[in-house]
């Protein structure tokens, strides 16, 4: 598949200043770091579990720039499904069985069905990548994965899984070979003995399909989010179900880390060498620069802005020192306006009821002007 787009005009219009670009030496144009620093980043990631099931959860990420929820959601979902590592049975030895195209006396299922059931065993190893599990059962009975004894370094996660049914008074002895991997590896891909990681492959060794992925389901949906009165932002809701070997939020974090590692290879510049880089306001101003912004810069509704103006609240630094009770005592200021202001402050990592020493500063006008120039 070929994805192509003529983006030369887009690069010029956006002021892109890549390494070696003719725009990078233009002093009056956009700083390189503005391309990522000036984008809206999520102010919260909320994990909502499905009842008491710790392996099922929705992760709500907002606000995101328009279009970013689809981009990030698709990338995270694909990486979670394909690239997270887990453990699986990749081969077995069944007593008196030389290949999978046979049946066992006294066992209801044939060997092919038994192998299919074994491939669905979910387990977790601790401190090792390989292990051989043994199971010895005497019929008649149902053989389930929970009959494999837990050890300090191995935990069976789905103990009710049916492996086979012994209809007669027969012995069923099996060894299961476990290792770590990613994705799905069918038995037909394990043609080479070296791929098994075994020094001496038994004559009755039978390869099985191995599903290593710890993710059972992963999906996402995109909704609208808002900052103040602007609603053209995205909310990403990721629904993840795991096999209990990891938690849903851990799965998303691992997928993000994999993407971070892959994307790092595309960055061909050193941020510390950026030309004409201005000093960050936070390094030279005695206050958080957001506190020095005037409230009329915020995208507030007319009612909320007029309430602040009538209460002589000029700077955000004045606003955050008010408590919610103080604000609700302001004439014409209600819960809707309070929620609006709380959302805007949260997007700047601020909140009502803050204590700011030595506020307001004597030179607040000059400091505010310095911030606006930055």
UniProtKB/Swiss-Prot annotation:
Residues 282-374 are annotated as: Alpha C-terminal domain (alpha-CTD). Homodimer. The RNAP catalytic core consists of 2 alpha, 1 beta, 1 beta' and 1 omega subunit. When a sigma factor is associated with the core the holoenzyme is formed, which can initiate transcription. Keywords: DNA-directed RNA polymerase, Nucleotidyltransferase, Transcription, Transferase. This is DNA-directed RNA polymerase subunit alpha. The N-terminal domain is essential for RNAP assembly and basal transcription, whereas the C-terminal domain is involved in interaction with transcriptional regulators and with upstream promoter elements. Its EC number is 2.7.7.6. It is an enzyme of class 2 (transferase). NCBIfam families: PRK05182.1-2, PRK05182.2-5, rpoA. GO terms for cellular component: cytoplasm; DNA-directed RNA polymerase complex. Residues 1-270 are annotated as: Alpha N-terminal domain (alpha-NTD). InterPro entries: DNA-dir_RNA_pol_insert, DNA-dir_RNA_pol_RpoA/D/Rpb3, DNA-dir_RpoA, RBP11-like, RNAP_asu_C, RNApol_insert_sf.
């Amino acid at each position: 598949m070929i994805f192509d787009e003529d983006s030369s005009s887009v690069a010029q219009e956006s002021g892109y200043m890549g390494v070696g670009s003719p725009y990078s030496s233009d002093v009056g144009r956009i700083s390189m770091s503005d391309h990522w620093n000036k984008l809206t980043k999520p102010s919260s990631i909320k994990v909502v579990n499905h009842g008491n099931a710790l392996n099922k959860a929705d992760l709500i990420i907002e606000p995101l720039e328009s279009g970013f929820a689809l981009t990030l959601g698709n990338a995270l979902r694909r990486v979670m499904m394909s690239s997270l590592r887990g453990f699986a049975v990749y081969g077995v030895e069944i007593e008196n069985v030389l290949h999978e195209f046979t049946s066992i006396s006294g066992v209801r299922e044939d060997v092919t069905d038994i192998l299919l059931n074994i491939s669905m065993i979910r387990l977790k190893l601790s401190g090792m990548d390989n292990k051989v599990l043994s199971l010895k059962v005497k019929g008649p009975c149902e053989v389930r994965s929970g009959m494999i004894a837990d050890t300090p370094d191995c935990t069976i996660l789905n103990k009710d899984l049916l492996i086979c049914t012994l209809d007669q008074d027969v012995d069923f002895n099996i060894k299961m070979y476990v290792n770590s991997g990613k994705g799905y590896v069918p038995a037909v891909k394990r043609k080479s003995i070296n791929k098994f990681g075994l020094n001496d492959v038994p004559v009755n060794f039978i390869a099985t399909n191995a599903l290593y992925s710890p993710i059972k389901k992963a999906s996402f949906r995109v909704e609208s989010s808002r900052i103040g009165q602007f609603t053209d932002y995205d909310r990403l809701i990721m629904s993840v179900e795991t096999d209990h070997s990891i938690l849903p939020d851990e799965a998303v974090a691992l997928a993000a880390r994999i993407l971070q590692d892959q994307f790092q290879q595309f960055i061909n510049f050193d941020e510390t060498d950026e030309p004409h880089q201005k000093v960050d306001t936070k390094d030279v101003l005695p206050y958080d620069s957001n506190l020095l912004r005037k409230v009329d810069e915020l995208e507030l509704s007319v009612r909320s802005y007029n309430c602040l103006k009538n209460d002589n609240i000029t700077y955000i630094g004045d606003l955050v020192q008010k408590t919610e009770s103080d604000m609700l005592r302001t004439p014409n200021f209600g819960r809707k306006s309070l929620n609006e202001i709380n959302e805007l402050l949260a997007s700047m990592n601020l909140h009502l009821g803050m204590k700011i020493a030595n506020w307001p500063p004597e030179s607040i006008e000059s400091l505010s002007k310095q911030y606006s120039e930055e």
